[in-house]
Amino acid sequence: MYRFEFSNIDNTSQYEELIKEFLQPSQYGNEGETILSYDFRGDKNDLKRQIYRDLSKLTGMSPKWGILTGIRPVKLAAELQDRGEDPKKVLMEQYLTDETKADLVCDILEYQRAKAGKPAPDSLSIYIGIPFCPTRCLYCSFTSNQVDQDAMEPYLQALGKEIDFAGEAVKADGYKVETLYFGGGTPTSLTAEQLDRLLSRVSTAFALGGVKEYTVEAGRPDTITYEKLQVLQDHGVDRISINPQSMKQKTLDLIGRRHTVEDVYEAFEMANKAGIEVINADLIAGLPEETAEDFANSLEEIIRLGAGNITLHTLAVKRASRLKEMDENFNYRDEELREQMLTAAHERLRGRGYVPYNLYRQKHTSGNTENTGFCNDDRPGLYNIRIMEEAQSNLALGAGGISKIYFPEENRLERVANVSNYEIYIDRIDEMIDRKIKGFFGNR
């Protein structure tokens, strides 16, 4: 067991995140017999490199992301490139990143700059949250609630009030909406009539003529109907997400999805019939009891169904999830298997004409891996790119929404958060609006 001692350091959180890439929580603590002492003398990355090399020597492990513990490697590479530095060289030499990861980051950066470009100074992305799901998945810790029609109507009324306010404020501040994203939760938990009402309100509040991408997450295929898809199409939605996570029925049952593989096939068929231009599909590597063959088969089915965007996630076991309660150390099991799953998936997708367009990392992710978005036909998820590069203001409406106003002169963001509990959001909607008046609008 190890014990870490730090001197001249007030906040050790980023170093602890690096330590967790090597050691399980049960392998270090105040009672550890092997003591590793560190004294901060200037550059935090020097200290992180020392920790990385010490733990590599002691454990025999060399995590491929090196000392990077942040969730936005592509943003870092962009900043390096803008300063005239070689991102790949810096990632490998200073951040100790494996060459395969450095190449992936640089490929994505090159694609983003060629296809998405930099956002206009007056552009804005908008997120609208619907915090309801049919069920809560085994691995999930998002603030979402099981569908309750009695709760939905009061929530939609409060959300509508925030939308109406935001529409006027966006116009007054001179913003132009570039992307619009409905997330959750599962927005298609709403009825077709509720969706129509909500999207009509959005169309009235905001000028959407210049919107480049309009996404609605329809993640749970059991919530999708042709009537709902027609509503989305009628309102200009051009991208949806249908997220099976796995195409193995045993896995779906185990993780609490409560839909069938057949539901996924039917959802794709309906979406194509309705004329939705881009369908994203999420798959998760590392789900309980899945093999590399299971994951490969799921990916092949999604490719065959014609998904224009495919996002490969690595299972992230959050503290508040039921899976964490069942197995505290699940993240540390089968790390090589998850890496094998993702490596094979990347090769297969590239071989089938898909290119990686977006990447982010999460805390609590299994095996020190990452989440990567792939696209074909040059239709990347633009909203996802903008959120990760953090060079544009993002207005987030609804319970749990965290707005971010961007100050380009200083290259920094300020956050303005809504409360996460939807019942408190309803009760305090006027306060949520007031927060945006004081913290978001009028600050450009």
Name these PLM-found stretches.
Residues 129, 241, 309-314, 385, ...:
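Beta-strand scaffold of nucleotide-dependent catalytic cores
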Residues 1-75, 79-90, 159, 373, ...:
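Radical SAM enzyme core and accessory elements
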Residues 11, 100, 107-108, 139, ...:
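Key residue(s) within conserved catalytic/signature motifs
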Residues 121-156:
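Canonical Radical SAM [4Fe-4S] cluster-binding loop centered on the CxxxCxxC motif
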Residues 55-65, 82-126, 173:
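N-terminal [4Fe-4S]-dependent radical SAM core
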Residues 315, 362, 400:
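Histidine- and/or cysteine-centered catalytic micro-motif in compact active-site loops
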Residues 144-344:
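Conserved non-cysteine loop/helix-boundary elements of the Radical SAM core domain that shape
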Residues 320-397:
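A C-terminal junction/extension of Radical SAM enzymes
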